[in-house]
Amino acid sequence: MEKKDINIVNVNKSFDGVQILKDINLKIEQGEFFSIIGPSGCGKTTLLRMIAGFISPDSGAIYLGDENIVNLPPNLRNVNTIFQKYALFPHLNVFENVAFPLRLKKVDEKTINEEVNKYLKLVGLEEHSTKKVSQLSGGQQQRISIARALINKPGVLLLDEPLSALDAKLRQNLLIELDLIHDEVGITFIFITHDQQEALSISDRIAVMNAGKVLQVGTPAEVYEAPADTFVADFLGENNFFSGKVTEIINEELAKINLEGIGEIIIELDKKVKIGDKVTISLRPEKIKLSKNEIKKTKNYMNSAAVYVDEYIYSGFQSKYYVHLKNNEKLKFKIFMQHAAFFDDNDEKAIWWDEDAYITWDAYDGYLVEVESEKK
């Protein structure tokens, strides 16, 4: 298969006077598994359909390799698309559904047999070749659509929320298979999803979109651990947000922040700040330790606070705690912990709701997500 990268340059698109895409610039490397995520209506599917050739941009360019494909019809773009709906032919069996693109090209029968069997084996359906598609599960039908797309040997495979119609267990299994298939064929995959966990678990890089704009591009770890702004931080998983002012620059790595309702804490300096700057801190629920007894600080950059447990929710592999500060009921924290962490080292009593407790977190676990300098 011929590998192609995608370069999207200054792309804009409006419908009925409403701008859907705003100055989109993206470079997707050949062979990447690249995910585009964002809330409904953010423009991610419009962008995918634009790459496929179903929609034309109002301005800008889309390069497939060195060629600007904006004016090329879909059938000449060397790009295949897999949609949420499988679009299979119910009157054809599995073999003929996968063979259909080759029959359109009038490929000889020997090659068709070799290629269809090759791609059915790739998606694990070689033993189902004579079955009607109606006899197969939703996950199997989606794998047929993947095989049919790949048999065309596209330079880029576009996947428009292909797993959203499946149940959670099947979705997870097919996600793993998609990753293995991508490793096998080595072409560029562009994956559209609203499921953040899907994107985080499978992607080489992720673009986060909102309101027609690309807010951040990075590896899963980069966008999760170092979000560009509060929207990205909030969209990718759960978070706690707090506002305050910089009171002291300790060194190049650490600063003291006076957080509203908490008091002075220590935070890692991920951005340049100066004393007096207003800041927003994000703190992931899984980064916080909850204890029945106050934990003695072993490091001078640990933060702690006394809290009251409002709610406890058991959710299988972890438990979720919702607490508020003892001295400020309006300031609430979400805390997610693995079950081994439910017990205090001293008395091994579980923490439930309607109890006093203590929270601690490392200065390096919080993230300085936004900075607003004081106006002079």
Curated annotation (Swiss-Prot):
Q: What is its main location?
A: membrane
Task: Provide the catalytic activity annotation.
Answer: ATP + H2O + polyamine-[polyamine-binding protein]Side 1 = ADP + phosphate + polyamineSide 2 + [polyamine-binding protein]Side 1
Gene Ontology terms for molecular function: ABC-type putrescine transporter activity; ATP binding; ATP hydrolysis activity
Extract the PROSITE patterns matched here: ABC_TRANSPORTER_1 (PS00211), ABC_TRANSPORTER_2 (PS50893), POTA (PS51305)
For this record, an example GO cellular component is: ATP-binding cassette (ABC) transporter complex
Pfam families assigned to the protein according to its UniProt record, in alphabetical order:
ABC_tran, TOBE_2
Please tell me where ATP binds in this chain: G38, P39, S40, G41, C42, G43, K44, T45
What UniProt keywords apply to this chain's record, in alphabetical order?
ATP-binding, Cell inner membrane, Cell membrane, Membrane, Nucleotide-binding, Translocase, Transport
Q: What is its EC number?
A: 7.6.2.11
List the SUPFAM superfamilies hit by this protein, alphabetically: MOP-like, P-loop containing nucleoside triphosphate hydrolases
Q: List the disulfide bonds.
A: none
What highest taxon heads this organism's lineage? Bacteria
Membrane topology of this protein: Peripheral membrane protein
- Write out the annotated subcellular location: Cell inner membrane
Q: Which residues form the ABC transporter domain?
A: 6-236
Function noted in UniProt? Part of the ABC transporter complex PotABCD involved in spermidine/putrescine import. Responsible for energy coupling to the transport system.
Q: How is this protein organized at the quaternary level?
A: The complex is composed of two ATP-binding proteins (PotA), two transmembrane proteins (PotB and PotC) and a solute-binding protein (PotD).
User: What protein family is recorded?
Assistant: Belongs to the ABC transporter superfamily. Spermidine/putrescine importer (TC 3.A.1.11.1) family.
- The entry's protein name is Spermidine/putrescine import ATP-binding protein PotA
Could you tell me which species this protein originates from?
Fusobacterium nucleatum subsp. nucleatum (strain ATCC 25586 / DSM 15643 / BCRC 10681 / CIP 101130 / JCM 8532 / KCTC 2640 / LMG 13131 / VPI 4355)
Which gene carries the instructions for this protein? potA
